[in-house]
Regions:
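C-terminal lobe and pocket-closing loops
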Residues: 186-268, 306-309, 317-323
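Mature extracytoplasmic/periplasmic domains
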Residues: 195, 202-209, 220, 265, ...
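Mature N-terminal segment immediately following signal peptide/propeptide cleavage
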Residues: 1-10
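Hinge/capping helix and adjacent helix->loop/strand transition within the periplasmic-binding protein
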Residues: 7, 32-37, 56-67, 76-171, ...
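Early extracytoplasmic/lumenal segment of secretory-pathway proteins
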Residues: 37-55
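Beta->alpha turn/N-cap motifs
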Residues: 69-75, 161-162, 178-185, 201-204, ...
């Protein structure tokens, strides 16, 4: 079927960013594993956190197997949380897996703050936690961590972008933050001894970064006191574990979906892909999730009204709820 054909890969982000780079690392090898070795060309459709491209893909793209979409995982929480502007159904998409789904976050405070134990962290009043803008992943994670650790009147300070938060930590503008291990390595926190680490967020549950295992950090779920709080964490983890999504539109013939699934799995297992991914991303290793596994993550997300309402409280600016 694909002999002599051209596949259009829509990227739900701008050209040149990390989303584009990762898509190119995948596409360059994927084309060699699709029977017929079609040509893959790129289109870019940034906007509305991925909703613009997802809406277009769901409603306007012909399901002929010749158009793919690679888009941020954020389209899933937008749908589950009932956000405005969602004109697609996440349960009708043909998921083709992701090149990255494992993440290990840590909550740490700067050494100068003197919060070198959970008892001291809980006793301190108004600890300043820097985060990304309101509603973003880092903001939500910061509020959930502060809530589950029973911190006293924590001050979540949003609005930081990129390395601005690293600088703010260094200057003492904020006392702590939630960060990936990649950020912690970049800041050289272990070698410099400039941070106290308190808890981790494993995505998926059970995943640990070998570089930080020796710290023995408890996963944040150890601080959950009720099934409600565990569902909240399952939602938070699931939204991230979905990873960046590669998909075919609903209505695509099943045989073409299966051809593409098989090609993606062969790509994920190909050493050439791993080498290309690491080269283009500046040293990152891929952590692939198969098409069926990705679809299962979406299927298992908590969607009950109570959990949705609770999660939205952490995404907003209201005072943290009582436990």
């Amino acid at each position: 079927f694909y002999q002599g054909k051209t596949i259009t890969l829509i990227v739900g982000a701008g050209a040149g960013g990390m989303g584009d780079i990762r898509a190119r690392a995948l596409a360059s090898v994927l084309a060699t594993h699709i029977p017929g070795k079609p040509t893959i060309v790129f289109e870019y459709m940034p906007g509305a956190g991925g909703r613009k491209s997802a809406n277009h893909f769901f409603n306007s793209v012909r399901p002929d197997g010749l158009t793919l979409l690679r888009v941020s995982s954020s389209i899933v929480p937008y749908a589950v949380l009932g956000e405005k502007g969602v004109k697609y159904d996440i349960d009708k998409l043909n998921y083709l897996g992701t090149t990255e789904h494992r993440l290990y976050y840590m909550f740490f405070t700067r050494k100068e703050a003197g919060l070198n134990s959970l008892d001291k962290l809980r006793a301190a009043n108004g600890v300043r936690i820097g985060s990304s803008p309101v509603g973003h992943t880092g903001y939500i994670q910061s509020r959930i961590v502060a809530y589950l650790l029973d911190m006293k009147a924590p001050k979540i300070i949003p609005g930081y972008e990129g390395q601005d938060l690293d600088v703010a930590i260094g200057r003492g503008e904020v006392d702590g933050r939630v960060a990936t291990t990649g950020t912690a390595v970049q800041m050289d926190l272990l070698n410099k001894g400039t941070a106290d680490f308190h808890t981790s967020i494993e995505i998926p549950r059970g995943f640990k970064d070998d570089r930080f295992v020796h710290l023995g950090l408890p996963d944040i779920e150890q601080f959950a006191k009720s099934p409600k709080e565990k569902r909240l964490l399952a939602m938070m983890r699931g939204f991230r574990a979905v990873g960046t999504i590669l998909m075919l539109p609903p209505g695509t013939p099943k045989d073409l979906v299966e051809i593409m699934k098989a090609a993606v799995e062969k790509t994920h297992a190909d050493p050439v892909f791993h080498k290309e991914y690491k080269k283009l991303t500046g040293g990152d290793d891929p952590s692939p999730l198969s098409p069926d596994e990705q679809a299962q993550v979406v299927k298992e997300l908590p969607r009950d009204p109570e959990t949705v309402a609770l999660f939205k409280k952490f995404a907003g600016t209201d005072t943290l709820p009582s436990r």
